[in-house]
C-alpha cells in the first residue's frame, strides 16, 4: 500500500490483515496507527518512491494499492509496479463527474441527471479545490492509469463523501458540537438542506477497497463506492441526531435569514451515485449499518472536541429568534 496511515488507509490495512494477507505499507513515518499493527512498514518520501522499490519488492506482489494517488510518487504511484505486481487499485473520488463541476459552480450546467453511473459524463474543468498539498487531480490519475492499462490492470474506486473515526476533515464537527451543547435547534440553509450526496462510512469504504483487492474480476474496472441511498443534508442531520440521542429541531431557512457563516450558495445540483456495479459484479455489501457507523463517528468526534473551545452561538440565537 502506498500511503495508508491517514483516514481510510488504516481500516483497509486492518481488514486485509484479517483476511490473512501480507501487507506492506509505504509511508512517510509521521504516524503509525494502531490499526496497522501487523503490517510491514517502509518509511520514505513519496517523491523518492523509486529509490525504495527494492525494499518494496523483496517479496512477490499481487496487488499495489494507492490510497492517495493525488500525491506524486515520482509520477503516478501504482505505475511504478507495472511488470512487478499483478494488479493495481487506486482511490479517486466522485468529484470526477461533470455534476461536481456544476455543483462547484464552475460549469454553468445544465444540471446533470442523477444518479451518476460509472459511464456518466466526466468534468472538463480542473478541480477548483485541488489543495496545494496535492499534485494530481483525480482525473489526471484516472487518465494516467487508463493510458497504461496494457502494462498494469488498475481498478479505480470512486469514493463518496466519507465519514467516521480518523476523519481529517471533521465532517460531523458542527453538528456533534451543537448536540453536545444541547442546542435546541440547528439551522440549515434551505439549499443545503435539499442537497443529496452519496456518503460512505469509513469501514464500509475500506471494505469496498478490500473487496476489489481480493477479487481478480475487478481488474481494469471502475466502481462507484458508497451507500445505496443518498440522504439530503436535512435527512442526514436528523440521522446524526438520532444516533446521538438529540431531541432538538432542524430549522431550515432561506439564506437571507441566516448569519453569513451559515449561508451556502449552491446551484440546484445533487451528486448521487449508482453503486450497483460493485454490488452486482463483486458482491460488495456494507459491513456496518448507518446508525452503527454514525455512533462510532460521533464517539470519535466527541473525543476530539474534549479540549476545544466552544463556538459562539449568538448569531444563530438571533436568527432563530427572528424566525419565530
Language-model regions, residue ranges each:
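Conserved beta-loop-beta element that borders a ligand/cofactor-binding pocket
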Residues: 141-166
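NAD(P)H-binding glycine-rich loop region in Rossmannoid oxidoreductase-like domains
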Residues: 5, 30-90, 96-99
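N-terminal Rossmann NAD(P)H-binding glycine-rich loop of SDR-like oxidoreductase domains
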Residues: 1-19
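Glycine-rich Rossmann NAD(P)(H)-binding loop
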Residues: 2, 164, 188-195, 223-230, ...
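Mid/C-terminal beta-alpha module of Rossmann-like enzyme folds, strongest
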Residues: 208-270, 275, 308-324
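Conserved Rossmann-fold NAD(P)-dependent oxidoreductase catalytic core, especially the SDR/UDP-sugar
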Residues: 76-139, 147, 155
Amino acid at each position: 500500500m502506498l500511503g495508508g496511515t491517514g483516514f481510510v488507509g488504516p481500516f483497509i490495512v486492518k481488514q486485509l490483515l484479517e483476511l490473512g494477507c501480507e501487507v506492506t505499507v509505504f509511508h512517510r513515518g509521521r504516524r503509525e496507527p494502531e490499526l496497522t499493527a501487523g503490517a510491514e512498514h517502509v518509511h520514505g518520501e513519496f517523491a523518492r518512491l523509486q529509490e525504495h522499490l527494492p525494499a518494496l519488492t523483496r517479496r512477490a506482489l499481487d496487488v499495489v494499492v494507492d490510497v492517495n494517488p493525488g500525491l506524486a510518487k515520482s509520477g503516478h504511484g501504482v505505475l511504478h509496479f507495472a511488470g512487478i505486481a499483478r494488479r493495481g487499485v487506486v482511490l479517486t473520488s466522485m468529484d470526477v463527474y461533470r455534476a461536481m463541476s456544476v455543483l462547484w459552480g464552475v460549469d454553468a450546467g445544465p444540471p446533470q441527471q442523477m444518479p451518476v453511473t460509472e459511464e456518466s459524463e466526466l468534468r472538463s474543468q480542473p478541480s477548483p479545490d485541488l489543495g496545494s498539498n496535492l499534485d494530481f487531480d483525480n482525473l489526471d490519475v484516472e487518465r494516467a492509469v487508463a493510458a497504461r492499462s496494457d502494462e498494469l490492470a488498475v481498478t479505480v474506486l470512486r469514493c463518496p463523501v466519507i465519514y467516521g473515526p480518523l476523519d481529517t476533515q471533521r465532517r460531523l464537527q458542527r453538528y456533534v458540537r451543537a448536540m453536545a451543547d444541547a442546542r435546541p435547534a440547528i439551522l440549515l440553509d434551505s439549499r443545503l438542506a435539499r442537497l443529496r450526496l452519496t456518503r460512505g462510512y469509513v469501514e464500509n469504504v475500506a471494505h469496498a477497497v478490500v473487496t476489489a483487492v481480493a477479487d481478480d474480476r475487478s481488474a481494469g474496472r471502475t466502481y462507484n463506492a458508497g451507500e445505496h441511498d443518498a440522504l439530503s443534508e436535512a435527512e442526514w442531520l436528523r440521522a446524526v441526531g438520532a444516533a446521538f440521542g438529540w431531541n432538538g429541531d432542524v430549522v431550515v431557512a432561506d439564506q437571507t435569514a441566516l448569519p453569513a457563516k451559515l449561508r451556502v450558495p449552491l446551484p440546484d445540483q445533487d451528486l448521487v451515485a449508482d453503486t450497483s456495479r460493485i454490488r452486482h459484479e463483486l458482491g460488495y455489501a456494507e459491513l456496518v449499518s448507518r446508525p452503527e457507523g454514525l455512533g462510532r463517528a460521533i464517539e470519535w468526534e466527541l473525543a476530539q472536541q474534549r479540549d476545544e473551545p466552544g463556538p459562539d452561538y449568538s448569531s444563530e440565537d438571533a436568527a432563530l429568534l427572528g424566525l419565530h
